[in-house]
Regions:
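Hydrophobic/basic alpha-helical segments
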Residues: 1-390
């Protein structure tokens, strides 16, 4: 988003690996754990015991194939699975660094991105990087899946269109054209970061479960209804909702309508009853405040642990050259200049996070534990949301 504010378009590539967790070579994994991460002795023996000795068979129509000992793969649903995959593919980060691209990696999800001038769009560095990554995967028994890998240009409509018109990116021998949107870890990101398609998907999924809740509501208690609502519907509204800061008022309204209907369903009030009163009774924050709640909690964690680094480095403490009353108020510096004045900048974490944090009371910002911060924050946002409401 900041690149777009600086009149640069960004190109993002989401790489997909075929049967990622099933193709990890046990011998390579253990050698890498020893040589690069210093896992030796009993710890290495335990690791080898954990990944080896597993068997599998195929069952079709009641007939089972012979049992085969697995020489590759780690349990995908295990706690260690993503960590072992990250350990196995750790050299990929060095390849990306060599080509001066930025990246995010979580288990088998890898995204490469870079920003380019719209007038001088050159995909050479991206192409060379994907070629080297494909070669490394092949040498280590893994394979990129070009049919599920995606490329997207992000920026304003003009910037995104210019980047998308620059050509295609070759992944594992196949030409992958630019997409209008990509789905990353359950969030659909479009080329203008409007989140229109993502919110449509969220609303559709919530309404499906809301209809089911209405059907069974007379048969269950209010407490059970609240549990069902939170686990099946509110969780969808809250998932990655900090990304929605700066989205259109129309999108926020669509989500708010879902939450209003949910509150009425839980309390079994009519459609013409006050949604605000239902939300207050359930002690639920409205959508906008839920977004601000998630952002504020994220900032608090970043200030305490400075992790992840790619986010913590975007937050700068507010400092004055001389001592003022604002010096000890735990404020963050808000970006200034042309970027801050652009409407698109409200979607940038480096812009909206300090703004949300600085809007909190000093009492809230000074909380010494995460639990006390969450309690104080929710109370503060609740009062702000419902004071003077009809």
């Amino acid at each position: 988003v900041i690149a777009a504010c600086n009149r640069r378009s960004s190109v993002l590539i989401a790489l997909d690996i075929s049967a990622a967790f099933d193709t990890i070579d046990h011998d390579i994994l253990c050698r890498r754990a020893d040589s690069e991460f210093g896992i030796r002795g009993p710890a290495l023996a335990w690791l080898r015991s954990f990944v080896s000795g597993r068997s599998s068979y195929v069952s079709v129509g009641g007939t089972n194939s012979p049992v085969t000992l697995n020489s590759t793969g780690v349990p995908q649903g295990s706690v260690l699975g993503p960590m072992l995959f990250a350990l196995y593919t750790s050299p990929v980060s060095k390849i990306i660094d060599h080509h001066s691209l930025q990246y995010h990696m979580y288990a088998d999800d890898t995204q490469l991105y870079t920003s380019l001038q719209p007038s001088q769009i050159d995909l050479t560095a991206i192409q060379l990087c994907t070629n080297d990554i494909h070669r490394w995967y092949a040498e280590n028994g893994m394979m990129l899946n070009p049919t599920k890998s995606e490329v997207i240009a992000v920026g304003t409509r003009v910037q995104a269109a210019a980047a998308a018109a620059s050509g295609t990116v070759e992944i594992a021998g196949s030409q992958v054209p630019f997409s209008s949107d990509v789905k990353l870890l359950g969030v659909t990101i479009d080329s203008t970061v409007s989140f229109d398609k993502h919110i449509s998907s969220v609303v559709r999924g919530c309404n499906y479960h809301l209809r089911a809740l209405r059907h069974i509501r007379p048969l269950i208690t209010t407490d059970v209804a609240k549990s069902v609502a939170c686990s099946l519907i509110s969780s969808r509204l809250d998932y990655c909702n900090s990304l929605l800061h700066g989205t259109s008022a129309k999108n926020i309204h669509r989500l708010q309508v879902v939450q209003n209907d949910l509150a009425r369903a839980v309390l079994m009030t009519g459609r013409r009853s006050s949604a605000t009163e239902s939300l207050k009774t359930l002690h639920w924050l409205p959508i906008t405040e839920r977004i601000n709640y998630k952002i504020a909690v994220t900032v608090y964690k970043l200030r305490q642990s400075h992790s992840p680094q790619y986010l913590s480095e975007l937050l700068v403490n507010y400092q004055q050259p001389r001592t003022l009353r604002s010096s000890d108020k735990l404020l963050l510096r808000e970006p200034e200049g042309p970027v801050r004045k652009l409407a698109l900048s409200t979607k940038a974490f480096s812009v909206f996070a300090p703004s949300v944090w600085n809007s909190l009371t000093l009492n809230c910002r000074m909380c010494t534990s995460l639990n006390s911060f969450k309690r104080t924050l929710k109370t503060e946002l609740f009062i702000k949301a419902y004071t003077d409401q009809p």
